[in-house]
């Protein structure tokens, strides 16, 4: 059983590497076989088809790994503890991806999410649900911070939660898009 679990994890990691720099259409079963050292039959056994592998890779590497849901409940009672724990999660994820040979996590996620948008019919609904869950967690964290006097009581909790969820963490993603565009146009910028 452990061998099967390891094979499945390896397939997901190898698929992530391939999809992080190639569009969905450009990743073939032959490339998946070559990258993983696993036969097409085994890939189909674990994931049914390329779409199944891609969907599971999305869940594992996009929705589960970079989620504030990964912060344990004891750390969700303080904004500072929550924020620091989440930053550590992101650092660990970045290091794991570097070990996989992926130097820019946000660029990889951008490529994968664009492929998902174009090839997974319910991706918008899944992403929207995930986003709502993330927003609700931030709202609860900020509400806790207000009730424990960690931050002022006269703030608009929803606005501050949106600030954290959108502006702070999404800024990283959009900066990556700017990097891609600038490289494509062969220009440089400084933030």
Protein language model annotation of sequence segments:
Residues 47, 111-120:
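Short helix-capping/turn signature of helix-turn-helix
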Residues 1-6:
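N-terminal intrinsically disordered/low-complexity leader segments
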Residues 56, 70-106, 157-164:
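Hydrophobic alpha-helical connector segments
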Residues 80, 102-106, 121-148, 159:
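Amphipathic alpha-helical packing segments from all-alpha helical-bundle domains
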Residues 10, 18-60:
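Helix-turn-helix
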Residues 50, 57, 61, 86, ...:
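Hydrophobic/aromatic residues within well-ordered alpha-helical segments
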Residues 124-132, 146-191:
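Hydrophobic/aromatic-rich alpha-helical bundle segments in the mid-to-C-terminal region
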Residues 12, 83, 87, 135-143, ...:
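An amphipathic alpha-helix signature
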């Amino acid at each position: 059983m452990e061998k099967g679990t390891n094979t499945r994890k390896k397939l997901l990691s190898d698929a992530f590497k391939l999809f992080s720099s190639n569009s969905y259409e450009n990743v073939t079963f032959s490339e998946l076989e070559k990258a993983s050292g696993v036969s097409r039959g085994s890939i189909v056994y674990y994931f049914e088809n390329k779409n199944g592998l891609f969907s599971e890779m999305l869940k594992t590497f996009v929705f589960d790994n970079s989620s504030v849901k990964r912060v344990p409940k004891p750390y969700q009672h303080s904004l500072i503890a929550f924020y620091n724990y989440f930053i550590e999660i992101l650092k660990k994820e970045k290091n794991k991806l570097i070990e996989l040979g992926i130097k820019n996590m946000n660029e990889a996620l951008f490529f994968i999410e664009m492929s998902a948008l174009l090839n997974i019919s319910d991706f918008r609904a899944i992403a929207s649900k995930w986003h709502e869950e993330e927003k609700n967690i931030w709202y609860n964290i900020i509400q806790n911070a207000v009730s424990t006097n960690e931050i002022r009581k006269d703030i608009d909790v929803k606005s501050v939660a949106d600030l954290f969820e959108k502006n702070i963490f999404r800024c990283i993603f959009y900066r990556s898009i700017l990097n891609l565009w600038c490289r494509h146009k062969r220009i440089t910028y400084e933030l």
